Amino acid sequence: MSFSREEDKKLKFKTSKKLKISPTFESMNLKDDLLRGIYGYGFEAPSAIQSRAITQIISGTDVIAQAQSGTGKTATFTIGMLQAIDLKRKDLQALVLSPTRELASQINQVVSNLGDYMNVQSYAMTGGKTMKDDLNRMQKNGCQVVSGTPGRVLDMFKRHLLNTRNVQMLILDEADELLGESLGFKQQIYDIFTKLPAACQVVVVSATMSKDILEVTKKFMSDPVKILVKRDEISLEGIKQYYVNVEKEDWKFDTLCDLYDSLTITQCVIFCNTKKKVDWLSAKLTQSNFAVVSMHGDMKQEDRNKVMSDFRSGHSRVLISTDVWARGIDVQQVSLVINYDIPEIMENYIHRIGRSGRFGRKGVAINFITSSDLSKMKEIEKYYRIKISPVPADLSTIS
């Protein structure tokens, strides 16, 4: 796993108390089988967020952890969780919630990989399949960890199909999305929390953490340890950020075709703001003999799974998506992100461009800007204290 430790070391954190920093995984006193899984997964030494947050999670305290995309946040809470659960018991002990089915499934895979030598039983509980399927799988093998979406998990709780009596850890991944107002998850999170034991530990994780979200966490967290990246450290250093002033919406497509012809692309994600735009752009590019796949929330789950599988394996190189793909999905070969539309929610900018340059790799983000988008881009630059440069005339210099 290629990882830029030099860039990772530059990160500066604000913490609510002085923390012990663990320089190695061995210094965390982890289970032997968990260590085997960590090294088997490809980790050599903990990243900045891992060296600070894992031991806090293991200690049982509530934790709020923020770090850049691609620095190992998922492994941070997964390692802490796997260390904490009792493998002798086969009942549900840890619950991970995330905003999309794809992310919930990816987290479940990380749990399986890191827990490969522990015989841990985990399950991805998402929409798109029947509750009977969920029940049959869990009853057959037992289930110590559930990674799911809030709606499906809450439904299982309300039907008394999940026993929450021994749940000792609740993890909210991409917490700004789960606790924000835009997608309607917040009330579901509150309802889930009321069905968990009073002593349940809560871990909140995200790449962005606004003051409003931190305020919301006070309702269900008890004196949490906060590990937050300083604002001017949030931008992703390994990613070159550019814009193309297309002036008019109608000129975006021709600009995209020109880029397509000029750049050498390993894999690319193109973001649009609406499902309708994704379908339109996918059809338009296909008509122009460009090989693309697309994904958004209205697609059937089996179709979304097929798109993800093909993209991960490299069978498809260009994916067009809404923000459903901006959150935490890790495909390491992605080298280019194109914002066909500037994101409507400011925080989604960092999540989108974080799909390139995963775990210290170099990446490129290109933003298509109409005249009416210029003020939005200036707001993004001001908010993240970054400079988005015009695309150079010689495109070979940006790859």
From Swiss-Prot:
Residues 54-227 form the Helicase ATP-binding domain. ATP binds at residues 67-74. Pfam families: DEAD (PF00270), Helicase_C (PF00271). A motif (Q motif) lies at residues 23-51. Its EC number is 3.6.4.13. It is an enzyme of class 3 (hydrolase). Residues 238-399 form the Helicase C-terminal domain. One of its GO terms (molecular function) is RNA helicase activity. It is found in: Nucleus, Nucleolus. Keywords: ATP-binding, Helicase, Hydrolase, Nucleotide-binding, Nucleus, Ribosome biogenesis, RNA-binding, rRNA processing. One of its GO terms (biological process) is maturation of SSU-rRNA from tricistronic rRNA transcript (SSU-rRNA, 5.8S rRNA, LSU-rRNA). A motif (DEAD box) lies at residues 173-176. PROSITE patterns: DEAD_ATP_HELICASE, HELICASE_ATP_BIND_1, HELICASE_CTER, Q_MOTIF. ATP-dependent RNA helicase involved in 40S ribosomal subunit biogenesis. Required for the processing and cleavage of 35S pre-rRNA at sites A0, A1, and A2, leading to mature 18S rRNA. PANTHER family: ATP-DEPENDENT RNA HELICASE DBP3. Belongs to the DEAD box helicase family. DDX48/FAL1 subfamily. The Q motif is unique to and characteristic of the DEAD box family of RNA helicases and controls ATP binding and hydrolysis. This is ATP-dependent RNA helicase FAL1. It comes from Vanderwaltozyma polyspora (strain ATCC 22028 / DSM 70294 / BCRC 21397 / CBS 2163 / NBRC 10782 / NRRL Y-8283 / UCD 57-17) (Kluyveromyces polysporus).
